[in-house]
Amino acid sequence: MTLRHPILAELDPARPILIAGPTASGKSALALEIAEAQGGTVVNADALQVWSCWRLLTARPTAEDEARAPHALYGHVAPDRAYSVGAWLAEVAALMDKGCDSGRGRLIVTGGTGLYLNALSRGLAVIPPTPPEIRAQADQLVRQPGGLARMIEDLDSSTRARIDLRNPARVQRAWEVLTTTGRGIAAWQAETPPPLIDPAAAHLLVLNPDRDWLAERIARRFHLMLEQGALDEVRAMLPHWNPDALWAKAIGAPELVAHLQGRIDLDEAARRAVIATRQYAKAQRSFFRGRMRDWRWIGIGG
């Protein structure tokens, strides 16, 4: 990976670092380079790399990379466990406490899940979980004709003004919170506690790769995953496949499952997976532009 800026020389070794960027942009490589040069623990901030069932398919650091510097929160969650941004934040807090106790508290947090990085640097509202029966009711309502519009009508005015009403998942989440707690999600978010990492005391970086460079890298990386055995990873999970499970959201998993089930050939599965990955990268860029404009953007490729 070639950076346009001599970033290593500009980083204070005493400050934590947060590195965002679209998939396949080289975040993990940069984090490892920083850890080797300045010390620190590389901490995963990718919601798909937490699952123990995926290493190749989610491009987790290799065992060799993990041996070069301390890594944390990679592949540590079993597929049958529930996991959330709140659980991830609690684990990061534990790492920070452990680091303070040992005198090795510098974290290099890297990943493409903007929600994780945003919660770490801005705080996360503590909202009671949604009971299964409320979730089932919401799932049923949102599938009905006009169900989403009814959900929007039920929301309080502050929440309607705050959330993206074009996003069904956001609307359903807000409806579930209101139905469960009797309070709008905007009211809960107004009570957001201070962030675990003070943005003013950290280096906040966003890798911003050239689009053509990234598209070529995405395609090359997925084919390399297949060569290294990603299809076998998916085959091992096929008996447990549930497309609604969080671990099943790994990019490329649905496409490879379709191949293993005999619905498409491997070339078509790879083609679709590469397209899905590019679409995911586009969505990541959109999130970063909206939420991380004040971070330092680093151009790559091109």
Curated annotation (Swiss-Prot):
Cofactor(s) essential for the protein: Mg(2+)
Positions with a binding annotation for substrate: T23, A24, S25, G26, K27, S28
EC code(s) of this entry: 2.5.1.75
Superkingdom, natural source: Bacteria
Site (Interaction with substrate tRNA): T113, R135
Reactions accelerated catalytically: adenosine(37) in tRNA + dimethylallyl diphosphate = N(6)-dimethylallyladenosine(37) in tRNA + diphosphate
Molecular function GO labels: ATP binding; tRNA dimethylallyltransferase activity
InterPro entries per UniProt: Dimethylallyltransferase (IPR039657), IPT (IPR018022), P-loop_NTPase (IPR027417)
Keyword tags: ATP-binding, Magnesium, Nucleotide-binding, Transferase, tRNA processing
Biological process (GO), any one: tRNA modification
Cited SUPFAM superfamilies: P-loop containing nucleoside triphosphate hydrolases
Family, similarity comment: Belongs to the IPP transferase family.
Annotated function: Catalyzes the transfer of a dimethylallyl group onto the adenine at position 37 in tRNAs that read codons beginning with uridine, leading to the formation of N6-(dimethylallyl)adenosine (i(6)A).
Name by which UniProt lists this protein: tRNA dimethylallyltransferase
Organism: Paracoccus denitrificans (strain Pd 1222)
Gene responsible for this protein: miaA
